[in-house]
Amino acid sequence: MNQQQAIVAARRYFLDDANHYGCAETIYMVLKEAYRLPEPADPSAAMVLNGGIAYSGNLCGALGGAALALGMLAGRRIADHKQAKVVARRTMMRLMDEFQAQHGATNCRDLTGIDFRDEKQHRRFIESGLWRTRCMGQIETVIRLLDVLLSSPSLLAPEEPS
């Protein structure tokens, strides 16, 4: 799956009128499919990450879903578990830095201006359709950034012993 196909898949999941999948679930499914990770159609592990982790406004769900997929990917590509953790963290830090540079924040509340725990604010946000552009744009950013980061041979590869 190339970058454009991943974006098309993400739009199909996220922008579905039933609003079945949130930001974290969408990115998690797309990345699992793109990188041939187990059970790409099951986004269950990511469902509580939407809205900045259980609507708390913390880490953007697209980044949270990406973190889950990166951990799985590193675990499959790097046999040594400790090394896989180092590499996954390094890659995630780069992703977060690049995302922050492009969007000015990594926290959902800062990115959206919404307290999702407030039912009125949440409803207005959904009804406004702003999630279709703002959140979808952030999902697309994560896909694009990971495409670049994961194509770099130095990332998501074990470090050479010194």
Residue ranges and their predicted role:
Residues 23, 60, 108:
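Short cysteine clusters
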Residues 89-162:
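C-terminal binding/interaction regions
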Residues 46-50, 56, 158, 162:
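Glycine-rich, charge-dense phosphate/pyrophosphate-binding loop(s)
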Residues 49-68:
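Glycine/serine-rich anion-binding loops at beta->alpha junctions
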Residues 1-3, 30-48, 117-119:
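Acidic-glycine-rich active-site phosphate/pyrophosphate-binding loop
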Residues 34-44, 72-91:
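Phosphate-handling active-site elements
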Residues 1-18:
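Polybasic, low-complexity association/targeting segments
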